[in-house]
From Swiss-Prot:
InterPro entries: DnaJ_domain, HscB, HscB_C_sf, HscB_oligo_C, J_dom_sf. It comes from Vibrio cholerae serotype O1 (strain ATCC 39315 / El Tor Inaba N16961). GO terms for cellular component: iron-sulfur cluster transfer complex. The gene is hscB. HAMAP family: HscB (MF_00682). This is Co-chaperone protein HscB homolog. Interacts with HscA and stimulates its ATPase activity.
Amino acid sequence: MNYFELFGLPIQFELDGSLLSSQFRALQKRFHPDNFATASERDRLMAVQQAAQINDAYQTLKDPLRRAEYLLSLQGIEMNAEQQTLQDPMFLMEQMELREELESVTACADPEAALVAFDTKVTAMQRHYLAQLQGQLAQSEWLAAADQIRKLKFIAKLKNEVERVEDQLLG
């Protein structure tokens, strides 16, 4: 049973977050190990394993990037173990320029405002790539979606760097 089936959801990128959360709570309640305290050792172990699978499935489905990777894995495309690199020189150049821009934020007259503006720009890029990914997955364009996921991973790392710089500025 795949994660979507576990939660009774259609196998697609777009999903109802509130339905996912309510299904998660219901499954958590149903398979909580405390409910099996008086059960046999085997049943208790199965409940713990089921609870772990439910938690893993929820964490995967609630995160758009992990959900997209999981959808590709259902199509036989494994992104986690891949050695494939992104073959988009324009995107890679843009990423280098963005990282240089982020490094220069701390030298600005108002670094906090510069960081907020930079983060706003990166968030807009992230939304743009997520929208493209959603369309590619809906059209079963698996290889294009895989490239989009690679791009989104770059952007996720950049967002982490923004948080690091923010911590430095506030620290």
